[in-house]
């Protein structure tokens, strides 16, 4: 094979090599540019993060950890991983960080592998109260391999029932208690959770995947020094690539987590993603990230207040973080219908169960809304109040139509307003 024969492989563009995938990416770029992203677990990464993740680091196998690899030629990917580790430690004020987990589920599985045996008891927030699949859902590995004791929110105010957490912990003596969730809009009392964990001899694990950016930005109390271990994804409010991290101050636990990630669960880490994690963590260490985190919360409060003023119920009466659960029953809508109608109006969100939801999981009585992606675009309170009013327009139109097809006229009118709004806040201009 000559250099002439390999030249196309190394230099042919995606558009020329695979026009179908190129076309799909182009359409997705258009969707992201023109639609308002309100999915609470999504965000928009910087060009620098994209460049790192799309780099030649993807070519390198690097089983093991920096300085202790099972492959040669790792001296430069070691630099990337060491930077990611040091930046994570600095950002969250901890002594140990593992940046290799490929996802949020795998980071949580690694903690289970390190601290639990099959059949052990652990406690986690019930999925219907805002927990995550990996916190003990019966359809998830966590619910199949372990004895799960779920806690939840109180009926009425929809706030965490800490007395019930204490009582269940005393009754069941769990080995691990998980605090944190995916759809709880209030401040977590880490200190109280640690007191409960200590009272029954349990480890306290905090899954701060959703709020890590707020913790880093000073908008939510840090789980340290209260927790034994914290896990977080690197996307969501941290605004990095999709992946996970495990953080702790305990050296013995850190060794267990490292062994659980590799070789316990994973083989070669995704070095291009780890490089991108390092970039995102570096961005989060800049002073402007504090402003970004503060704006996320301001925007969430503005959106929540606008919806409530428009006759829409928000679970627990508001939000202290980046997200809110909207109870649609007063609008005679389901989450499934509302998600579809808002999507047709170029407002993207996800249907979501609400506490004590009478509807099926694929229907739901609510939608979950979040502000991180819109805040990244530059939206402030005024824009989120406008967005709140647009959501109300769609929901009111849906109520009048009372059908899965929605209200085409209202949705078309809102769609035009959304395009005008998003055109004022362009993204990725260099992509053409």
From Swiss-Prot:
EC number: 2.1.2.1
UniProt cross-references to CDD domains, sorted A to Z: SHMT (cd00378)
Site (described: Plays an important role in substrate specificity): 235
GO-annotated biological processes: glycine biosynthetic process from serine; tetrahydrofolate interconversion
One GO cellular component, as annotated: cytosol
Pathway involvement of the protein, from the record: One-carbon metabolism; tetrahydrofolate interconversion; Amino-acid biosynthesis; glycine biosynthesis; glycine from L-serine: step 1/1
Keywords: Amino-acid biosynthesis, Cytoplasm, One-carbon metabolism, Pyridoxal phosphate, Transferase
Residues recorded as bearing N6-(pyridoxal phosphate)lysine in the entry: 236
Major localization listed first in the record, in broad terms: cytoplasm
Molecular function terms, GO-annotated: glycine hydroxymethyltransferase activity; pyridoxal phosphate binding
Record field: transmembrane: none
Compartments in which it is found: Cytoplasm
Cofactor: pyridoxal 5'-phosphate
Catalytic reaction list: (6R)-5,10-methylene-5,6,7,8-tetrahydrofolate + glycine + H2O = (6S)-5,6,7,8-tetrahydrofolate + L-serine
Binding site for (6S)-5,6,7,8-tetrahydrofolate: 127, 131-133
PANTHER family in UniProt: SERINE HYDROXYMETHYLTRANSFERASE, SERINE HYDROXYMETHYLTRANSFERASE 1
Function per UniProt: Catalyzes the reversible interconversion of serine and glycine with tetrahydrofolate (THF) serving as the one-carbon carrier. This reaction serves as the major source of one-carbon groups required for the biosynthesis of purines, thymidylate, methionine, and other important biomolecules. Also exhibits THF-independent aldolase activity toward beta-hydroxyamino acids, producing glycine and aldehydes, via a retro-aldol mechanism.
Family the entry assigns: Belongs to the SHMT family.
Subunit field text: Homodimer.
Protein name: Serine hydroxymethyltransferase
Annotated source species: Rhizobium rhizogenes (strain K84 / ATCC BAA-868)
Gene: glyA
């Amino acid at each position: 094979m000559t250099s002439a024969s390999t030249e196309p492989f190394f230099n042919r563009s995606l558009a020329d090599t695979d026009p179908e995938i190129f076309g799909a990416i182009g359409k997705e770029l258009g969707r992201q540019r023109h639609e308002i992203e309100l999915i609470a677990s999504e965000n928009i990464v910087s060009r620098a993060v994209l460049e790192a993740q799309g780099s030649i680091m993807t070519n390198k196998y690097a089983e093991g950890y920096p300085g202790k690899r099972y492959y040669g030629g790792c001296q430069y990917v070691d630099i990337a991983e060491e930077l990611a580790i040091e930046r994570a430690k600095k950002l969250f004020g901890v002594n140990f960080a593992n940046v290799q987990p490929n996802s949020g589920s795998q980071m949580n599985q690694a903690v289970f592998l390190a601290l639990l045996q099959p059949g052990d008891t652990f406690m986690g927030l019930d999925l219907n109260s805002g927990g995550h699949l990996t916190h003990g859902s019966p359809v998830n590995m966590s619910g199949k391999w372990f004895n799960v004791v779920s806690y939840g929110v109180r009926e009425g105010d929809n706030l965490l029932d800490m007395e019930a957490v204490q009582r269940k912990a005393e009754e069941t003596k769990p080995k691990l208690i998980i605090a944190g969730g995916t759809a709880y809009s209030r401040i977590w009392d880490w200190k109280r959770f640690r007191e409960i964990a200590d009272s029954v001899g349990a480890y306290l694990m905090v899954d701060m995947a959703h709020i890590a950016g707020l913790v880093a930005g000073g908008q939510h109390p840090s789980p340290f020094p209260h927790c034994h271990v914290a896990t977080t994804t690197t996307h969501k409010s941290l605004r990095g690539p999709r992946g996970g991290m495990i953080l702790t101050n305990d050296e013995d636990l850190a060794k267990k987590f490292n062994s659980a990630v590799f070789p316990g669960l994973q083989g070669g880490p995704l070095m291009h993603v780890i490089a991108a994690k390092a970039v995102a963590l570096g961005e989060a260490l800049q002073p402007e990230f504090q402003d970004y985190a503060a704006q996320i919360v301001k925007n969430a409060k503005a959106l929540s207040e606008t919806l409530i003023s428009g006759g829409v119920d928000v679970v627990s009466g508001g939000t202290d973080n980046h997200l809110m659960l909207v109870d649609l029953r007063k609008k005679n809508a389901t989450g499934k219908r509302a998600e579809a109608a808002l999507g047709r109006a170029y407002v993207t969100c996800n249907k979501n169960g609400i506490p004590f939801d009478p509807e099926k999981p694929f229907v739901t009585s609510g939608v979950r809304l979040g502000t991180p992606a819109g805040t990244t675009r530059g939206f402030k309170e005024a824009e989120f109040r406008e967005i709140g009013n647009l959501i109300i327009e769609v929901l009111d139109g849906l109520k009048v139509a009372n059908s899965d097809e929605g209200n085409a006229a209202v949705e078309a009118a809102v769609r035009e307003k959304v395009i005008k709004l998003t055109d004022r806040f362009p993204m990725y201009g260099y992509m053409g």
